[in-house]
Amino acid sequence: MSGLLLKGINKVYPSGVQAVFNFCLDIRDKEFIVLVGPSGCGKSTTLRMIAGLEEISSGELYIDGKLVNDVVPKDRDIAMVFQNYALYPHMSVYDNMAFGLKLRKVPKEIIDQKVKAAAEILGITDYLSRKPKALSGGQRQRVALGRTIVREPKVFLLDEPLSNLDAKLRASMRTEISKLHARLATTFIYVTHDQIEAMTMGTRIVVMKDGFMQQVDTPQNLYDYPINLFVAGFIGTPQMNFFKCAKLVSEGKGKARKVYVSFIGNNKILLPGSVVARVKNIDEYLDTDKEITLGVRPEDIHQDQAFINTSPDTVVKARIEVIEKLGAETQIYCELDHESKESSVIDNSTQMIAKISSRAVINLKDIIDLAFDAHHIHLFDGYTEATILERDEGYEVISENAEGSAFVPPTPQEMRAQIDSARIVTKEMKAQMKKDKRMAKRTEAAAQKQAAEEAMKAESEEKTEENNDENKDAE
C-alpha cells in the first residue's frame, strides 16, 4: 500500500510569499494523480514538499499512514523524475541507473538484475553502455525513469518530465508512462502545465491556480462539469468561449414559460427544460439584473444544416474572421457583432471559436448561421465565477473522489484576500526568516557535502572490490 494524505498543507517562503494555501488531498494506492495549472500556481512546490525537498510551513503529510513532515527525503521511500533528467554525464546508462542502489550497498547481483529488468521494461537495453550525451531526449528521459524504477519506491513523483521533448516524442512518452504505471501498479504523482497530458494520463486531476486547489476530479468530469470559470477555460483545446454580462430571461407563463440566455446585443438561445432544472437558485437569476457568464465549447457549436434545423432557437449569426484547416476538422474564429466592419484585437467579448466539418464550404468574411448545443452549455455566476448548474446523472462517481467531488474552491475575491493577507510581514517575522534562510543554507551545504562524500566512498569501495577481484584472478 502506498497512499498519501495531505492535510491543510501550506507553504510560505522566507520573503513572506505564500505559494500553497490549505492543500488537502487523499491519494489512494495505485492512483495516477496529476497536478495541473499555469506557471506559478504551486504545483511543483507541492510536489517538492511531498518529496521532502521543500519544508512544509504548516499542515501534515502522511505516507502509508505515517506522518513524514520531519522525515528526510531519502527515508520517505519515494523517487522523483525531474524536468532536466539529472543524469551524471561521466557515467554510462547502466551506472546512472545503478548509482542509487550502490549507495545503499545493494549486492552487485541484485543491482545487475534490477537494472537489466528496468532497461527491458523501458526498451533501453541496447543503450546501457552509452553515455547520456550519446542519447536522444526521449532516451535520456527513459534512463531517468529507469533510475527510479530500480529503487522500487512506494511513490513516483514526476515534475514536468516531458516539457523538454518535441511534440511527437511527448505524445509517445505519454503513452509509455501510462503503460509503466499500469505495469508497476504503484502510486504516481505527476506535475504538468499541459492540460492534454493531464487529461490523457491522470486517473484524477488536481487543477490549481495561484496556490489554491480549484477542482479535484476525473478528466471527463472536469471537462463536462467544471466547477468554475477558471477550470472551464483551462480544460479543453481550444478553450471554452465565454460571453460575459449575460442574463436569464423568460417568456410566457406556467407550462408555456420558456427560459432563454440573453447575451451580446440581441442574441439569445433557448434553454432545454433539463438545463433549466439544473440551475441553482434560479429565482436569483431569472428576470433580474444579476449577470451570468455563458460558456460554450467550440465543439458544441455547429454549422451543419441538419443541426440548425433541429435547434432553430439556439442559432446565432457570425462573420468568419480566421479559418484554420486542420485536416480532420476546421476551426473558425468568428465575430458575433457581424455588422461591424472590423473585429477588435483588444476587445474579444464578441468573438468565438467553433469547430466545424473539414468538408464545409466557407470563405473569409462570410456571415453564417451557427447553432449552439444548448444541452452542453455552461453557466457561471457573474461575480463569484462559480458554476450555477447542478450535476446530473452524467456525472462520473468514483470511490476515490468522495471528498474531492464535494470540494468548493474559494472565489477570486476570497483568494485575493488570502494572498494579500499572507503578504503582511512584520519586522520580527523578517528577522526570523533571515535566520531560517541562513540555517537552511547551512543544512543544504552539509547535506551536499555528505552526499559527495558518500558518492566518493561508494566509488572508492567499488574500485577496491574490482582490484581485489583482479588480484584474486591473478593469483
Model-found features: residue ranges?
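Short coil-to-beta microelement around the adenine-binding A-loop and adjacent beta1/P-loop entry
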Residues: 16-18
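The feature captures the beta-strand-to-loop junction immediately N-terminal to the Walker
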Residues: 36-38
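Helix-to-loop junction immediately C-terminal to a conserved catalytic motif
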Residues: 51
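Conserved coupling/switch loops of ABC nucleotide-binding domains, chiefly the family-specific signature
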Residues: 57-60, 110, 210, 377
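Conserved ABC transporter NBD signature motif
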Residues: 59-67
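ABC ATPase nucleotide-binding domains
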Residues: 73-234
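Non-catalytic connector elements of ABC transporters
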Residues: 251-475
